[in-house]
């Protein structure tokens, strides 16, 4: 089950079969209500195999170190039986690989192109992939997250800012 801070109008459930096993996959929107999300996670504990967090990222890997968003900690600590995860693992592996594969296969030639990530802090591995492909990378973290009129030019600049700011940013309220 994915508990999302997003709109409940997008709720959905589907039965799927993988490797001969039947699974129910469900998305439950909380309409921005963090308390409702906490209650839902507590109610589902022990009744589902896993709970995914939607609309909030708990963990931010930045250059070999992972930072925990303080506001997300309570969501991760509610359950006693059921694991609670966010999309960090998917982002760390899958998004980076997709960028590299799309370029390598010629589906979306990215190498050397201009790339803008509005919030690279939440897509660190994707930013790395663009840098590896020699893209003219711009990171809009300061503009889009904090309203500072400053575009971070290139992965090395973004990386230095992310490492310096991550401890403080993860203390800010969600």
Predicted regions, residues:
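Short amphipathic alpha-helices and their capping/turn segments at secondary-structure boundaries
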Residues: 39-44
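Conserved mixed alpha/beta catalytic, RNA-binding, or beta-rich assembly cores of soluble enzyme
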Residues: 2-37, 56-174
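Short acidic/histidine-rich motifs immediately flanking catalytic phosphotransfer sites
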Residues: 46-49
């Amino acid at each position: 089950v994915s508990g999302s801070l997003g709109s409940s109008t997008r709720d959905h459930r589907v039965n799927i079969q993988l490797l001969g096993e039947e699974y129910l996959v469900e998305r439950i929107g909380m309409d921005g209500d963090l308390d409702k999300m906490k209650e839902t996670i507590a109610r589902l504990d022990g009744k589902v195999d896993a709970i995914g967090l939607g609309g909030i990222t708990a963990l931010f890997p930045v250059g070999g170190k992972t930072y925990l968003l303080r506001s997300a900690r309570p969501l991760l600590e509610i359950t006693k039986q059921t694991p609670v995860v966010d999309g960090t693992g998917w982002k760390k592996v899958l998004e980076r690989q997709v960028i590299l594969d799309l370029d390598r296969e010629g589906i979306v030639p990215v190498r050397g192109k201009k790339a803008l990530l509005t919030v690279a802090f939440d897509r660190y591995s994707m930013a790395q992939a663009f840098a590896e492909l020699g893209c003219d990378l711009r990171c809009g973290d300061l503009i889009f997250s904090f309203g500072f009129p400053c575009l971070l030019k290139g992965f090395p600049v973004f990386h230095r800012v992310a490492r310096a700011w991550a401890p403080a940013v993860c203390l800010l309220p969600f």
